[in-house]
Amino acid sequence: MARHLRIAAAQLGPLHKADTRAVAVSRLRKLLRDAHSMGAKFVVFPELALTTFFPRWWMEDQTEVDARYFEKTMPSAETQPLFDEAKKLGIGFYIGYAELTPEGHRFNTAILVGPDGTIVGKYRKIHLPGHADHKPKAAFQHLEKKYFEVGDLGFRVWRYLGTITGMLICNDRRWPEAFRVLALQGAEIVALGFNTPSENLH
């Protein structure tokens, strides 16, 4: 039986180091409203959508990095308005963020949120690109391996908005095995937010 689901790919644009969570959440809420006005039922936001793409910078004070860029709970008081907006509009979304677990583990994470504003599923990025060592002479750095651990939740699917949906994040898209594992579980949609530089590392 044919099914129709209108999905919006939300282009957030740059977030700067000085931008607060409130700034990011306000922009995300507006994108939700815009997508809803066009009939979308599901919005895919980018990787690490709540902050600037901080793995570009070498920072030595991990305590400061944790406080500034990582989410200890989801939703938090700062991000709850996004979930409330989704519930108000009856629209689901995928969003990426930096997760700090109660045990002190750090992951590049994405979640599926239902149209009732509740979290349906979570995925932690497995294929981390870049490097962990400092390269001060490089044109730019890509330090995901410094700031994140390899994801530990595997490749899963969820029943979501009448479909079977899986999640990946950015660099995961370069490995066909990830899609194959999801397809073998019946995935009909793979939500995949990314945050990619205009120039690649050489």
Task: Give short role names for the model-derived ranges.
Residues 13-22, 60, 71, 133-137, ...:
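Acidic/histidine-rich helix-loop elements
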